[in-house]
């Protein structure tokens, strides 16, 4: 089947905070802008219960913030298309972005595809996904009312979601491979003060146990080598992120782990190809840093296209 051809100025891939802000800035610069997203606009923001560190809001739910961003992104006539980008071709000044049914020809491309939660890679994880194993407390927490839950990880996401889950669970046990948390102090203090949260230190999950549903986990102490079982009906996993950069893997713009390498202007080594948000090689991945990236990328795409007129 021949694909539909769409000619545009800028293609933004992804509709998370970075992508929506990039679309806002590009379309506001009077560029014909198409924003492609395979899921619900907002990305991981939709999976966040409460956002308390985004300027302009003392407290806002993730989905509500995403809706505000989407309205802004569409304000200057950007086009929102649903689709899953398979690959990108770069031929000089022309870029071709492919989905299953369309080909977009653009002068500039902004990759804002974000990241997803890393899996543990242990027995039982894939088999029990959706049957007690989860990566989204906001999505699935309600199903564990009055049950015991394990949260794996020690960073911001793990600690924040552990606290969130206590409104449903009878007990939340945080299992962390180190002897101290990596989360921000305000999140640590909140977790340590919560009587429903317990901690198991210096331990890793070796297996998720259960036949038809999660029944617990087998853990190993990394210092002593001792193994033990912890009973629970749910396991929520927050052990880092993986870049969602499959569509650009052949372009030579990523590091060995798949994060896209850019300069401070969000430009990659390919002229006219930019990246923004969590898919970038960067230190801090937050909503506010993603929107900053997106604004910069949208503006720099405009600047780049202006140079093509010379």
Language model regions located:
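Beta1-alpha1 glycine-rich phosphate/pyrophosphate-binding loop at the start
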Residues: 2-76, 147, 159-185, 200
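FAD-site-proximal beta/loop scaffold in flavoenzymes
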Residues: 5, 116, 121, 126-143, ...
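A Rossmann-like FAD-binding core segment of flavoenzymes
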Residues: 6, 73-98, 103-106, 167-264, ...
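Residue-level detector of alpha-helix initiation sites
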Residues: 16-17, 40, 115-117, 156-157, ...
């Amino acid at each position: 089947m021949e694909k539909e051809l769409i000619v545009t100025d800028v293609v933004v891939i992804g509709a998370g905070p970075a992508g929506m802000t990039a679309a806002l800035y590009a379309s506001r610069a009077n560029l014909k802008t198409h924003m492609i997203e395979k899921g619900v606009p907002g990305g991981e923001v939709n999976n966040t219960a409460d956002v308390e560190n985004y300027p302009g809001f003392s407290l806002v739910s993730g989905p509500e913030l995403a809706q505000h961003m989407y309205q802004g992104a569409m304000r200057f006539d950007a086009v929102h298309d649903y689709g899953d980008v398979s690959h990108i071709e770069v031929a000089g000044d022309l870029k071709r972005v492919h989905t299953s049914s369309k080909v977009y020809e653009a002068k500039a491309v902004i990759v804002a595809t974000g990241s997803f939660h890393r899996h543990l890679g242990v027995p039982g994880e894939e088999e029990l996904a959706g049957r007690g194993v989860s990566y989204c407390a906001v999505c699935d927490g309600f199903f564990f009312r009055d049950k015991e839950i394990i949260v794996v990880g020690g960073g911001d996401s793990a600690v924040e979601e552990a606290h969130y889950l206590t409104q449903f669970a009878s007990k939340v046990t945080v299992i962390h491979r180190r002897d101290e948390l990596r989360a921000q102090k305000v999140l640590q203090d909140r977790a340590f003060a919560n009587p429903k949260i317990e901690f198991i230190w210096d331990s890793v999950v070796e297996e998720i146990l259960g036949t038809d549903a999660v029944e617990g986990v087998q853990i190993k102490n990394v210092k002593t080598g001792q193994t033990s079982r912890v009973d629970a009906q749910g396991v929520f996993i927050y052990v880092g992120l993986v870049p969602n950069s499959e569509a650009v893997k052949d372009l030579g713009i990523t590091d060995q782990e798949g994060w896209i390498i850019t300069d401070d202007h969000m430009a990659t080594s390919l002229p006219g190809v930019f990246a923004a948000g969590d898919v970038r090689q960067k230190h801090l991945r937050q909503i506010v840093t993603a929107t900053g990236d997106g604004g910069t990328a949208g503006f720099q795409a405009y600047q780049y296209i202006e140079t093509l007129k010379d």
